[in-house]
Amino acid sequence: MDEAVGDLKQALPCVAESPTVHVEVHQRGSSTAKKEDINLSVRKLLNRHNIVFGDYTWTEFDEPFLTRNVQSVSIIDTELKVKDSQPIDLSACTVALHIFQLNEDGPSSENLEEETENIIAANHWVLPAAEFHGLWDSLVYDVEVKSHLLDYVMTTLLFSDKNVNSNLITWNRVVLLHGPPGTGKTSLCKALAQKLTIRLSSRYRYGQLIEINSHSLFSKWFSESGKLVTKMFQKIQDLIDDKDALVFVLIDEVESLTAARNACRAGTEPSDAIRVVNAVLTQIDQIKRHSNVVILTTSNITEKIDVAFVDRADIKQYIGPPSAAAIFKIYLSCLEELMKCQIIYPRQQLLTLRELEMIGFIENNVSKLSLLLNDISRKSEGLSGRVLRKLPFLAHALYVQAPTVTIEGFLQALSLAVDKQFEERKKLAAYI
């Protein structure tokens, strides 16, 4: 118990003690080196680099042992609660190392058989999964959404380990993310599961992510038998029983619960449908008692979320479309990737939004391209994160069509792609 609390204490933000800096160590899949040896070598590396500025990643090493066994060493999440990159003295911090290897297997399907039918009820990943690597960093939000979610889950686990009386202080281990489509709610849930599996790798050997297929669960055929819901959650219970695993249950588009319940009240669905809804809520109530489970849910239609479910959620976080500042960060990350891959060539330095603010948005040879990117970001407001991540590809496909392009040429293409996106939206709206 004390060991578990110690792990969590290391992961939680400190108030009076020295700040904690998290370092993720991606061990190569082919490596069989002991974590203790990797830990020792990485700490030697960090001792040689006492001062860092914000997040930083090493992918090349002087030491042969690290080269053979480690893909990358990353100081991460320093900017979740601090607006600007600031110098960090590692010698004055508590450095928490999180060593992990990625699971390359991909998702498997959880099938439920009933007579002649075979329904895919859920997708199942063993975490940390290669599929989700880098997903956390790709998600950009204006408010401290990511840090709040991390702190929430850490607190739920701490309260469980400390045996806090849940009759006096209640928490349900249920997170609800709601907002318009395309804002990254489902991706954030998957990224959060991955991040927590890595951060708590000293406590749990691996993570399990079960994504329940809401459309199958509440289809007409499926609603005829609540037994299948119980059978599905029994499979989840088997995973939870393994105390070496941290289990995440993801229910996407949870408003399906409401749709089924309201249809029953209106008399348009069989009474079995309401039994299935109640069975799901009952099963959630049962599995949330376990300290190694977190229930993650999303909804595209905020006003249609079932009240019975909303009451169960500890955190109800709205995820809206990105602001111009967030869009700038998204575009900047896309441009950096294209320069790294030499599709945009030659490489040119772009200023961050904070750096533009510091020079008062004055145009000169250094700031000119970044100011153009800022203008494109402003006129992109209203587009979802999903669309924004596609636009660099569309810009190249529609307006570049060459192996390499200068950054000036690409920004011009990106601007045209944004204009085209809004034109297409107007045309679609005219037909509706």
Swiss-Prot record:
Record-listed ATP binding positions: 179-186
Impact noted for substituting residue 303 to K: In OZEMA9; uncertain significance
Gene Ontology cellular-component annotations: chromosome; male germ cell nucleus; nucleus
Result of altering residue 26 to R: In OZEMA9; decreased protein level in patient cells
The UniProt record lists the keyword ATP-binding: yes
PTM sites of type N-acetylmethionine: 1
Keywords linked to the UniProt accession: Acetylation, ATP-binding, Differentiation, Disease variant, Meiosis, Nucleotide-binding, Oogenesis, Spermatogenesis
A GO MF label: identical protein binding
UniProt GO BP: double-strand break repair; female meiosis I; male meiosis I; meiotic recombination checkpoint signaling; mitotic spindle assembly checkpoint signaling; oocyte maturation; oogenesis; reciprocal meiotic recombination
Related illness: Mosaic variegated aneuploidy syndrome 3: A form of mosaic variegated aneuploidy syndrome, a severe disorder characterized by mosaic aneuploidies, predominantly trisomies and monosomies, involving multiple different chromosomes and tissues. Affected individuals typically present with severe intrauterine growth retardation and microcephaly. Eye anomalies, mild dysmorphism, variable developmental delay, and a broad spectrum of additional congenital abnormalities and medical conditions may also occur.
Name of the protein: Pachytene checkpoint protein 2 homolog
Record organism: Homo sapiens (Human)
Upper taxonomic lineage: Eukaryota, Metazoa, Chordata, Craniata, Vertebrata
